[in-house]
């Protein structure tokens, strides 16, 4: 399906590698997410009609609210390239939220993060969950997976080898063998 059809279905995603517009400001990056659902014509934008001005003001207000909700409002005028890595990840998720999605697909959001950034990300994802978002997480950092997931599906070479609650998956012999090389004692802490 076309990307706009997926977004209209309420689904948005982030990628393992950060895909921000690094030479644009934080606010502008979030605004990009709002433009998938534009309600004005090309001519409205070209001539900056009252309709265009009203809708753009609403989108800007919404983008600022999203930045407030994730703690990046104070960075709205900074360039994305100047944000620390963890904040760039948050910004990418904020842009996904700006599309209006309720299902967020996060591909390796903790990749490249230190422990402090990973913990901050976990808290952020919990906040999203509490706000009614559904998060589908693809992640190899087992501490992140075990600390954030309600339910886990484990895939090994394209085949599902386990599913269940974190405590059950952590002790599943097939999971231990596939992801931890057969070291079963205290496999996931």
Feature map (PLM): residue ranges:
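Glycine-rich phosphate-binding loops of nucleotide-dependent enzymes
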Residues: 1-189
């Amino acid at each position: 399906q076309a990307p706009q059809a997926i977004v209209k279905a309420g689904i948005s995603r982030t990628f393992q590698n950060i895909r921000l517009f690094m030479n644009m400001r934080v606010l502008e990056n979030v605004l990009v997410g709002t433009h998938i659902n534009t309600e004005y014509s090309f001519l409205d934008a070209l001539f900056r009609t009252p309709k265009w001005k009203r809708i753009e003001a609403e989108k800007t207000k919404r983008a600022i609210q999203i930045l407030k909700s994730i703690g990046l409002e104070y960075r709205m005028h900074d360039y994305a390239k100047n944000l620390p890595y963890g904040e760039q990840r948050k910004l990418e998720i904020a842009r996904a939220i700006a599309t209006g999605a309720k299902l967020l697909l996060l591909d390796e959001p903790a990749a490249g993060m230190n422990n402090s950034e990973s913990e901050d990300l976990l808290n952020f994802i919990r906040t999203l969950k509490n706000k009614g978002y559904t998060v589908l997480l693809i992640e190899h950092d087992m501490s992140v997976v075990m600390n954030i997931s309600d339910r886990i599906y484990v895939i090994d070479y394209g085949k599902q080898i386990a599913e269940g609650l974190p405590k059950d998956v952590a002790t599943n012999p097939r999971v231990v063998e596939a992801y931890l090389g057969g070291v079963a004692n205290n496999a996931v802490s």
